[in-house]
């Protein structure tokens, strides 16, 4: 990725939009639809680069996936009829694809190799490999920590596992592997992490029990799977950039429709409310994956906040743009307990601080988060996404605080999760 993008957008931002389908749910819907023999339809999926890597891999395994307007039609021969791949399964920049398929392919017992791009090659996999090996998975990485991951057939066993970190990807890798075990698996979480895997298991007829921080699987649960249609809500992680953009840009009034507000993912709404931001939810739906329309209006004099504990996993992917929001508060804000940011596409603690500090903001990285001081855009230094889609979009939102254009290197990284992000932002500028 070498492209540079000059961002020249000014407020106010006004209008009504939808954001692309939720990335986490799209991945899981493709995986479960591919396992189930028959036809499943996924409506309004995210067709960014990450989810396309998941689609490509299941096509190699023998699943037919057709793109039709705003839906995917998945026709599967069933998991028992999957091909043995004769080439490396390329996961690109997708940590979700890599980690969840490490569990799923181990459970299936399909001899395979998972490998991604340079960024994925730097992201540690030991946190996934340890529990999978305790389930008797035959899986190895380079130096036992990194991709490529080499998977060979084995008989998966149930385990009683206490999570070491609040990670939905690690939890989901265990859950996908457990589908093929003759024993139940029990997972004890440290804090509540996003529960899309659990809710979507049920949607595809797979029994699973969750109570508090404990999750219990059913032996050989894969036998219950059935094809299903699934409507993917808008991704709250993508909506977050427009929420913050409207809050910090004078005169803005933006409404985002059909956003997923799963309580394990809605931390940004909680944070904005605690800061006194003008945010309203309406048109709410209930169910396993609730949705709402969200209206956001410019809010001066935002209150500082300390983000820690159980709030962190509920907003983990939004923390870079939340850090930008905190620069506009009237006092110093702190993010704690966010070590998980270190193992994202970049070390997001460092990249958030480094890039925003280049623009004149004042952030101090800590071992587990950030200290964010009230500060303003001071200089139009060239900044860099460092191939991290969320850093690229956060920097584009930061440009709204500048009176001059801002140049962002490697901006095409945003296509990982939000193709069309910049045109949508410009649409709100034009309506404003």
From Swiss-Prot:
Subcellular location: Cytoplasm
Any one Gene Ontology BP term: aromatic amino acid family biosynthetic process
Active-site positions on this chain: 317
Xref: InterPro entries: Enolpyruvate_Tfrase_dom (IPR001986), Enolpyruvate_Tfrase_sf (IPR036968), EPSP_synthase (IPR006264), EPSP_synthase_CS (IPR023193), RNA3'P_cycl/enolpyr_Trfase_a/b (IPR013792)
Signal peptide start-end: none
This protein's record includes keyword Transcription: no
Keyword Cytoplasm: yes
UniProt keyword annotations, A-Z: Amino-acid biosynthesis, Aromatic amino acid biosynthesis, Cytoplasm, Transferase
Catalytic activity from the UniProt record: 3-phosphoshikimate + phosphoenolpyruvate = 5-O-(1-carboxyvinyl)-3-phosphoshikimate + phosphate
Chief localization: cytoplasm
Protein name: 3-phosphoshikimate 1-carboxyvinyltransferase
Organism: Staphylococcus aureus (strain bovine RF122 / ET3-1)
Lineage: Bacteria, Bacillati, Bacillota, Bacilli, Bacillales
């Amino acid at each position: 990725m070498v492209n540079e993008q000059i961002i020249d957008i000014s407020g106010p931002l006004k209008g009504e939009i939808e954001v692309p389908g939720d990335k986490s749910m799209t991945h899981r819907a493709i995986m479960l639809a591919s396992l189930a023999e028959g036809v499943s339809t996924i409506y309004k999926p995210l067709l960014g680069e990450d989810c396309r890597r998941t689609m490509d891999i299941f096509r190699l395994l023998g699943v037919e996936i057709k793109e039709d307007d705003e839906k995917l039609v998945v026709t599967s021969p069933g998991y028992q009829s999957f091909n043995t791949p004769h080439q490396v399964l390329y996961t690109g920049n997708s940590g979700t694809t890599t980690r969840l398929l490490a569990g799923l392919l181990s459970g299936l017992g399909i001899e395979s190799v998972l490998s991604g791009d340079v960024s994925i090659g730097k992201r540690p996999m030991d946190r996934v490999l340890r529990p999978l090996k305790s389930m008797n998975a035959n899986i190895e990485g380079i130096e036992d920590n990194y991709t490529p991951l080499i998977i060979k057939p084995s008989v998966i066993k149930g385990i009683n596992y206490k999570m070491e970190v609040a990670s939905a990807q690690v939890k989901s890798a265990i859950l996908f592997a457990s589908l093929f075990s003759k024993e139940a698996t029990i997972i004890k979480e440290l804090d509540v992490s996003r529960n899309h895997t659990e809710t979507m298991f049920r949607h595809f007829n797979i029994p699973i029990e969750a109570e508090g921080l404990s999750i219990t699987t059913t032996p050989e649960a894969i036998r219950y799977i059935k094809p299903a249609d699934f409507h993917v809500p808008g991704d709250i992680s993508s909506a977050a950039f427009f929420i913050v953009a409207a809050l910090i840009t004078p005169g803005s009034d933006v409404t985002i429709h059909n956003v997923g507000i799963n309580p394990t993912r809605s931390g940004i709404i909680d944070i904005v409310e605690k800061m006194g931001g003008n945010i309203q939810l309406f048109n709410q739906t209930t169910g396993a994956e609730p949705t709402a329309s969200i209206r956001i209006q410019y809010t001066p004099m935002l209150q500082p906040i300390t983000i820690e504990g159980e709030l962190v996993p509920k907003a983990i992917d939004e923390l870079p743009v939340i850090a930008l929001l905190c620069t506009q508060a009237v006092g110093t804000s702190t993010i704690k307990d966010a070590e998980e940011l270190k193992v994202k596409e970049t070390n997001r603690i460092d990249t958030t601080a480094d890039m925003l500090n280049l623009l004149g903001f004042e952030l101090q990285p800590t071992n587990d988060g950030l200290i964010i001081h009230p500060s303003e855009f001071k200089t139009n230094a060239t900044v860099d996404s460092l191939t991290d889609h969320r850093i690229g979009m956060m920097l584009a939102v930061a440009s709204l605080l500048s009176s001059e254009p801002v140049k962002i290197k490697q901006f095409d990284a945003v296509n990982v999760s939000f193709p069309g992000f910049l045109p949508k932002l410009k649409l709100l500028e034009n309506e404003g």
